[in-house]
Amino acid sequence: MNPTAGTPSHNIDFWRDRPVLVTGATGLVGGWLVKSLLQAQADVVCLVRDWTPNAEIMRSGDLDRVNVVRGDICDQDCLERVLGEFEISTVMHLAAQTIVGIANRNPVSTFEANIGGTWKLMEACRRSPKVEQIVVASSDKAYGDAKVLPYTEDTPLAGMHPYDVSKSCGDLIAQTYANTYGLPVCVTRCGNFYGGGDLNWNRIIPGTIRSVIRGESPVIRSDGSFVRDYFYVEDGAAAYMHLAEQMAARPELNGEAFNLSTEIQVSVLELVDAILSEMGTSLKPVVRGEASHEIQHQYLDASKARNWLNWQPAFSLKKGLTRTIQWYHNYFQANQNPCNTTLPVGRAAAAA
């Protein structure tokens, strides 16, 4: 991977015809990862639970170029069958319930997917001798509300609320399969992903962009002071592939965790202002101050990934936002009523 290039490169010889299982392929990162794997000529298998027509992997036509297995990440028999029948070499585990609000309302289903799904996949991989690399997508939320910033990989995993706890547990389960059984696992912990293809309008970036395109003031559910680092989705997809390549060449990486981040701290209000500025609008956000059970301040130290993997993100926040905004402009232009030159008007999207 060329860390200074705008578009990360991959080892085509490594990926060509390689059987790769992607869980969570209909999600934001999963869709872009599948696109990158197809470009690298991998033989991609996607485990899909729900049929979501608006998912980027489906809208782009990429789903027609992969092997699709309808199944649930919590179905261990299904997982073992997929790993065996397709002779999977590399596993990219992205399947998860990722919405904090849903986790607070329905913790059991979140625990089943994020914790149960992880150990069932790890156990299926343990019983599948052809699996050579497993990349498990954890999250910065796995650290909980740690007081020492930035978070390093040595920061204890101490989630407090349902979503955070589910990521802490899944992370530790992946590590224990590496440490106890020698399973070839690495864990990634990323900041808040963003990019084209995210149609969850309750998220801060897509919700704000949609509001501006509709001529509406974006709504911030919190007081705007929450601080995060934001990680562009194409950087994430490239980093997962780069990590798998490194694991193949360096077995000593098994069991390691890596923070992936731009290491730039941005408050919600600063982020919204950056989007408004980039879109050239005079609209102002409506700040509701309603959000609860969310961590006030998080950002990651990615020096381990830089030093161990020779990795760094290709997209600055400005560059990523520019690319993302253009994607949404194209999306709404393609999906507006052809008999109406204006975009549909609705309520302003509430953002985190």
Tell me the role of every PLM-derived stretch.
Residues 169, 173, 177, 208, ...:
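Hydrophobic alpha-helix immediately C-terminal to the catalytic Tyr-X-X-X-Lys motif of short-chain
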Residues 89-92, 135:
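N-terminal Rossmann-like NAD(P) cofactor-binding module of classical short-chain dehydrogenase/reductase
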Residues 1-90:
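N-terminal Rossmann/SDR dinucleotide-binding element
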Residues 105-120, 127, 133, 142-187, ...:
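Catalytic helix-loop patch of NAD(P)-dependent Rossmann-fold dehydrogenases
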Residues 1-5, 39-42, 212-352:
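C-terminal substrate-binding subdomain of Rossmann-fold SDR/epimerase-dehydratase oxidoreductases
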Residues 95-98, 138:
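Conserved NAD(P)H cofactor-binding loop of Rossmann-fold oxidoreductase domains
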Residues 74, 98, 142, 186, ...:
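Conserved sequence/active-site signature of Rossmann-fold short-chain dehydrogenase/reductase
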